[in-house]
């Protein structure tokens, strides 16, 4: 029976031949923007590793039997779970980067400095970095937040939305216009699937299939191939 470490080691060995090797996609968008929906549809079948501490946090909340309505009475327990979820996600990202595996880094986009630092680090390793920004109006974000299984207070949604919006121009300068895809997700999921997501999926696959240009990446791959022949 394979252990967790055995499986991770196998992933590292197979990373050299992964379709999305040395490709990293950052997702940005506030609560209620529909990032999870976009990820499931636009990246389906690509094999990229999704890095999302919120997803790990939500799974742990459910497992612990806590409420997804985030009551104040459960704040201390939630904080402990959130810390563990972030640590687990960090380990997953570190392991994936060791194998230079393709990444989907799912966040809100509130913290420009954090994303900028992550992107610079990945570029230094040879990664091609792009961003998918899922955009909605504040009214739509507030309404969708009410309908979500895990909700946050309205003022939190508003604050997050404003912070993310203020970073759009910065992200365009950081990633470059050709590597930043902005999705208008004010319409229903059905309308988004039939029109926008088909286009996004094509762009994502085009970026994944673009030949690697980084000398650092090519040197790493050559070194790995040489090591495998020994």
Question: Which role fits each region the language model picked out?
Answer:
Residues 138-230:
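Conserved GTP-binding G-domain of TRAFAC-class P-loop NTPases and closely related GTPase folds
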Residues 15-22, 95-97:
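Phosphate-binding P-loop
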Residues 24-26:
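Short hydrophobic/aromatic beta-strand immediately N-terminal to the Walker A/P-loop
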Residues 30-31:
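The conserved Walker
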Residues 37-101, 113:
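Conserved substrate/cofactor phosphate-moiety recognition/catalytic segment
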Residues 123-144:
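Conserved phosphate-donor/acceptor-positioning beta-strand/loop module used by diverse small-molecule
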Residues 106-115:
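Acidic, metal-coordinating catalytic cores used for nucleic-acid/nucleotide bond scission
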Residues 1-16:
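N-terminal pre-Walker A segment at the start of P-loop NTPase domains
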């Amino acid at each position: 029976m394979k252990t967790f470490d055995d499986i991770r080691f196998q992933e590292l060995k197979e990373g050299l031949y992964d379709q999305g090797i040395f490709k990293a996609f950052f997702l940005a968008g506030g609560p209620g923007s529909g990032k999870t929906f976009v990820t499931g549809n636009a990246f389906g079948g690509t094999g990229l590793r999704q890095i999302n501490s919120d997803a790990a946090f939500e799974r742990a909340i459910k497992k612990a039997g806590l409420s997804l309505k985030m009551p104040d009475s459960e704040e201390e327990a939630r904080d402990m779970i959130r810390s563990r979820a972030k640590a687990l996600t960090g380990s997953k990202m570190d392991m994936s980067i060791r194998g230079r595996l393709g990444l989907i880094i799912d966040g809100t986009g509130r913290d420009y400095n954090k994303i900028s630092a992550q992107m610079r680090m990945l570029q230094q390793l040879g990664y091609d970095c792009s961003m998918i920004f899922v955009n909605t109006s504040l009214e739509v974000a507030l309404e969708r937040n009410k309908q979500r299984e895990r909700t946050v207070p309205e003022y939190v949604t508003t604050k997050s939305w404003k912070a993310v919006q203020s970073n759009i121009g910065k992200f365009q300068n950081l990633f470059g216009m050709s590597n930043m895809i902005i999705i208008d997700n004010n319409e229903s999921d059905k309308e988004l699937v039939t029109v926008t997501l088909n286009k996004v999926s094509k762009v994502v696959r085009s970026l994944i299939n673009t030949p690697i240009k980084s000398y650092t990446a090519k040197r790493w791959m050559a070194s790995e191939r040489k090591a495998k022949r020994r």
